[in-house]
């Protein structure tokens, strides 16, 4: 049986999910598409409960004390770190992949 990790979304990541939904449903007037995308993001994040090391390490952050990884979902990127000792995965950010998000972490 696979070891399960606890998933923790930061307040910022939660807000970013809400912002993604609002933008797509209101600005683009595509509520169903917004719902589908949020569901897909959530399903992919849930996958990290059992396979947190399945995504690539963010090379630009290798010099930092904490190791960050990225989960790519469509045009979005979930940035997270793994706390092996406490079996937790912290979802730090959920951002549009087309922007320079590396400077914002």
Question: Which role fits each region the language model picked out?
Answer:
Residues 1-40:
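Arg/Lys-rich, positively charged N-terminal/basic patches that mediate binding to nucleic acids
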Residues 21-24, 44, 68-70:
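Generic alpha-helical hydrophobic packing signal
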Residues 28, 73-77, 81-105:
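Enriched for short, Lys/Arg-rich terminal
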Residues 40-49:
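Compact soluble domain cores
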Residues 53-85:
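Basic/aromatic recognition patch in beta-strand/loop cores that engages polyanionic ligands
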